[in-house]
């Protein structure tokens, strides 16, 4: 049986993201970890929620130089963004959230 909820899960997550910056930061970190673990569907879904709750697709489009339509497509359930596109998106979201970029260390 497929249940329909009164409020879609993404909407609940977006509300929490808007009201809790720490949650947004942790969600972003979790999304990046999910990318490394190969759980692309989860990662793209959470990144999409973070964008909707914060920076927005229009501002993200301006920040990364990719049309809003292509960003929607890249972060959709069927999205398959290139590494270059994903890097631009992750960098812009991290900047928006105030997450410092790690510096590579070569030993």
Language-model features, listed with the residues they occupy:
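N-terminal flexible/basic segments that precede or flank functional cores
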Residues: 1-44
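Intrinsically disordered, low-complexity and often Lys/Arg-enriched segments
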Residues: 1-3, 102-107
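Residue-level detection of the helix-turn-helix DNA-binding "recognition helix"
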Residues: 76-77, 94
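DNA major-groove recognition helix of helix-turn-helix/homeodomain DNA-binding modules
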Residues: 83-100
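Short alpha-helical DNA-recognition segment
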Residues: 53-72
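Short, amphipathic alpha-helical "recognition" segments used to contact nucleic acids or chromatin
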Residues: 40-54
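Alpha-helix N-cap/helix-initiation sites
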Residues: 21, 25, 40, 57, ...
């Amino acid at each position: 049986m497929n249940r329909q909820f009164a409020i879609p899960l993404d909407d609940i997550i977006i509300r929490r993201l808007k009201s809790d910056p720490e949650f947004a930061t942790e969600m972003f970190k979790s999304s990046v970890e999910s990318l490394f673990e190969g759980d692309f569907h989860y990662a793209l879904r959470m990144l999409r929620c973070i964008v909707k709750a914060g920076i927005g697709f229009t501002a993200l489009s301006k920040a990364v130089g990719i049309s809003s339509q292509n960003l929607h497509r890249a972060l959709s359930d069927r999205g398959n963004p290139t590494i270059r596109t994903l890097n631009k998106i992750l960098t812009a979201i991290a900047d928006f959230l105030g997450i410092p970029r790690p510096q590579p260390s070569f030993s």
